Amino acid sequence: YLRGTKNSLYEGGIRMPFIVKYPKKIKPGRVNNSSVLCAVDLYPTLCSVAGIKTEKNYKGDGQNYAKVLLGKSEAKRKTDLMWDFGRNKHFGFPGNPYDRSPHLAIRSGKWKLLVNGDGSDAQLYDMELDKFEKNNIAGEHPELVAKLSKKVCEWYAQNKDKGLQTDL
């Protein structure tokens, strides 16, 4: 089974099935385990499948994967996916230490890096060869780890919750 549980950024914590039924358009029983889709992809994809144009000035982060849903191609992401799993003293750690991930992750092509916001506990996995995330190869690719760590840590710094802003 996949490593991780809910409350972790390993695949067992972030992957979920996506089941689509569209008679006469999508062949029943088809399974695609290689394409990486995310919630941000739903809007442009479902609009395309339904024949609806997105707004003229739409600038969402999602990609259109209509061809994947219709079984016409596999998908390669054009952009990286990034996750932050916030934690505090009351919430956020799976019971099994093996399933406790760093709080940031980035998926870039076949690579997945997990790391903490301070750069500690970097874990790199080749998702084409190691979908169960058993072989941390961060030590074999220090330049890639540095590049992806910088990218996800900068993303986190720009997007993290600043807390409630009030004049009171």
Annotate each language-model stretch with its function.
Residues 19-21:
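Short beta-strand-to-turn element immediately C-terminal to the catalytic PLP-Schiff-base lysine
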Residues 3-9, 26-35, 40-127, 158-159:
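C-terminal cap/loop subdomain of S1 sulfatases and analogous C-terminal strand-loop tails that border
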